[in-house]
């Protein structure tokens, strides 16, 4: 009996060690996004993997083939001859983080997409293409990325220009449309080759893309002359030559790590605009009451404010600028909130409070569930000067909760 008890204790210790080891290798943000995040998975030990990973030569092949396809689309020279030119097609770059997660999926030896949240990263949502083939040969075959990318591209012959805008997703063309989604500009890929039986080799190719494409009711690209609709912080064509940047003639080349600026909104008539960027206005000036754990996170193409609270903690972010309009105003807060570890309860209490002298504050309790920023608009039919408070609290004994704020904006007049 004593021997059985000792064996049981050893197994418990081993289990705890393995769990703690996995957690230590799984970044906190990935554990927030999904309890099944692909990066946090280990290799499939039942799979007889013989080769894995993507060489530098294969990286170059992947990037070059994607950009050739995108450039042909942008110039109106695609092989199908049916698609119009694109004015905002970005040039693709390699992304190591996307590649690491793609490799982890390939290591599972299963020809199946992972879930959207399972591959999410902080910078953006992530799209995905996969391809597999089985080869009979005595010698271990080399990876041949040309076949995978050609297979995805050939879906163009089932795609028509009617679906460019508004875009409608279709499983028959989803690989192609992700390849040429104009706002996607980062790609990272993974590869494995494993032996199913003697002299039978299965190759699995995975590419992850960011920002993700295939968004229904959006647009595949802006139909226009090449380079005409490039976002800020990019160059294209002859403009790239002036910047001494090599680029494809029809592709918008991102100039630096800040990424392209997709926001085309004119904020000149707004009475309050805080997006937490370094060049943002004085509207972002604030002070903190309660737990001062707020951080400003710089990511590609964006910035956001974030806080993580434990059970029993609370915080108030008080903005010092007044909002006032004789016609009232429409206040929009873009946020996301939830448990800091996926799968635990979403119990954080988030309030947007508007204060004015001599009156009871207006209070709006907001909630969300998911990893996407949610813009929430509130019509305020008052012409008094008002101050914004962002209040967040977590009940005692509850698991840690997070709140992210992307922007806070107000324009004159009530919301549409």
Curated annotation (Swiss-Prot):
GO CC annotations on file: extracellular region
Matching CDD domains: CAP_euk
Pfam family, one: CAP
Keyword Heme: no
Signal peptide segment: 1-24
Zinc found in the keyword field: no
Recorded superkingdom: Eukaryota
Modification(s) after translation: Contains 9 disulfide bonds.
Cellular compartments annotated: Secreted
Domain SCP: 57-217
Segments forming a coiled coil: none
Tissues in which the protein is found: Expressed by the venom gland.
Keywords of the record: Allergen, Amidation, Disulfide bond, Secreted, Signal
Note from the entry: The primary structure of this cryptide Pep-4 is identical to that of cryptide Pep-4 from Tityus obscursus (AC P0DRE9).
Family: Belongs to the CRISP family. Venom allergen 5-like subfamily.
Protein name in the entry: Venom allergen 5
Source species of the chain: Tityus serrulatus
